[in-house]
Design a protein with these regions (language model features):
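Domain-level signal for Mg2+-assisted phosphodiester chemistry and nucleotide/NA-binding surfaces
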Residues: 1-89, 145
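Nuclease catalytic cores that cleave nucleic-acid phosphodiester bonds
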Residues: 70-183
Length: 183
């Protein structure tokens, strides 16, 4: 995101999700205690991409050394062999899983403030649901800001939930420079 390199290494741009959660909680205008950070990500195939799979598992294990971190994975979808070799695997179902959890956990009163760090408009129905239906849960968003240029944020019609802007200086505080790929 904030790399100066034209072709950065695969581990450049990584951040520590717990450090991000702590940063957002510490900057809130309300006193908050960070109870959980949830990460949703695709998981490489152990047979099609053993190095990527091992790196992902190492990263997840590192994140989960703190009991406040929950990682939700779904298998990456790989292109069929007859398709272009340039096609990369894609995440499928991650946004749906995140949306279901965001809404379900609000209804069950499992959080009082949920911060959705995404610009994926597929998540708007979940944000709208929590905003309009939840009695207890408050929804907020987070998004990257590069210099004076915000990268966009999720909004609900004319309502703009509070947005936590994260910039390059913040990224320097939460960056994870670990290379999880084994040589």
């Amino acid at each position: 995101m904030f790399s100066e390199e034209s072709n950065p290494s695969s581990h450049k741009g990584q951040f520590d999700p717990l450090a991000l959660g702590e940063l957002l909680a510490s900057r809130s205008p309300n006193q908050r205690e960070l109870l959980e950070v949830r990460i949703y990500r695709g998981l490489p195939s152990s047979s099609r991409d053993p190095r990527g799979y091992a790196a992902a598992r190492a990263q997840i294990a590192h994140w989960q050394t703190d009991s406040r971190v929950t990682v939700v994975t779904r298998p990456l979808r790989y292109p069929k062999p007859e398709w272009s070799a340039d096609l990369k695997p894609t995440e499928k179902g991650i946004d749906v899983q995140l949306a279901v959890d965001f809404a379900t956990m609000a209804v069950r009163e499992q959080y009082d403030t949920g911060i959705l760090f995404s610009r994926d408009t597929d998540l708007l129905p979940a944000l709208e649901f929590v905003y309009s239906k939840s009695v207890v849960a408050r929804c907020e968003t987070a998004s990257w800001r590069n210099g004076n240029k915000p990268h966009g944020r999720l909004t609900i019609g004319k309502f703009q939930p509070f947005c936590h802007w994260v910039d390059a200086a913040d990224f320097a505080l939460i960056e994870d420079a670990t290379n999880y790929v084994r040589s």
